[in-house]
């Protein structure tokens, strides 16, 4: 699937315009996008990064990494996904960067999601849904998620987010109402962010292939 990821990432470069500040996500597909962005780095003003991992890769390419507090809203955000449904709703957060990813998506006029074909699903939920949680609330949130959804929350032991929080991965879900589930989980005290991108889905999904498919 690495070639499909690369093809999707290369296609996303078509959306980058001269003078832009580009929002950049996290993950294996985004790594290909950063490499492609490095070839045109002289044409853009810089990037806003969703993770320390992406920040390091951007800087390796000589791309200036900027603070979202100073840039204001962005024209473009490019990121991957763990799952994508036909309505461009996403599950994200396998790399534990979901909160910063959601912040940048919210601040961006256009959100381009780049995936390989294996990430396309008819209904979200086969991939465990990540939920970022304040550490002291981990058990409370897990109990409430179980009661609310019937899904099985599993603590991602040993993982600490860039924000200093922990992640619960909720298994065995069928997300037939992504917007409703995102809203409900966000109401649980201690939840920082839910890895459902439904209220703010992708505007465009690029599926890697020969040629790439644009949805």
UniProtKB/Swiss-Prot annotation:
Gene3D superfamilies assigned: 3.30.70.260, 3.40.50.1360
Q: Which GO terms describe its biological process?
A: D-ribose metabolic process; pentose-phosphate shunt, non-oxidative branch
Q: Where does substrate bind?
A: 26-29, 79-82, 92-95, 119
EC number(s) reported in the record:
5.3.1.6
Q: What is this protein called?
A: Ribose-5-phosphate isomerase A
Could you name the active-site residues? 101 (proton acceptor)
Name the gene that codes for it: rpiA
What Pfam families does the database record attribute to this sequence? Answer: Rib_5-P_isom_A (PF06026)
Q: Which major enzyme category is it? A: isomerase
Q: Which family does it belong to?
A: Belongs to the ribose 5-phosphate isomerase family.
The species is: Xanthomonas axonopodis pv. citri (strain 306)
Taxonomic lineage of this organism? Bacteria, Pseudomonadati, Pseudomonadota, Gammaproteobacteria, Lysobacterales
Pathway(s) where this gene product acts = Carbohydrate degradation; pentose phosphate pathway; D-ribose 5-phosphate from D-ribulose 5-phosphate (non-oxidative stage): step 1/1
The source's superkingdom equals Bacteria
Q: What keywords are assigned to this protein?
A: Isomerase
């Amino acid at each position: 699937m690495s070639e499909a990821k690369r093809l999707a990432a290369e296609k996303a470069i078509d959306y980058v315009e001269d003078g832009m500040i580009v929002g950049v996500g996290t993950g294996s597909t985004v790594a290909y996008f950063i490499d492609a962005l490095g070839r045109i780095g002289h044409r853009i003003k810089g990037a806003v990064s969703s993770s320390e991992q992406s920040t390091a890769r951007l800087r390796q390419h000589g791309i200036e990494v900027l603070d979202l507090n100073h840039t204001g809203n962005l024209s473009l955000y490019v990121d991957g996904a763990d799952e994508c449904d036909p309505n461009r709703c996403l599950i994200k957060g396998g790399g534990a960067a979901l909160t910063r990813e959601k912040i940048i998506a919210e601040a961006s006029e256009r959100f381009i999601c780049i995936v390989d074909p294996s990430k396309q699903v008819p209904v979200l939920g086969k991939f465990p849904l990540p939920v970022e949680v304040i550490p002291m609330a981990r058990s409370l949130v897990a109990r409430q998620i179980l009661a609310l959804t019937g899904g099985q929350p599993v603590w991602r032991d040993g993982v600490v987010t860039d924000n200093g929080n922990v992640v619960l991965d909720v298994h065995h879900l069928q997300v037939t109402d992504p917007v409703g589930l995102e809203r409900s989980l966000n109401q649980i005290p201690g939840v920082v962010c839910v890895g459902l991108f439904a209220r703010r889905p992708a505007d465009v999904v690029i599926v890697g292939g020969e040629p790439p498919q644009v949805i």
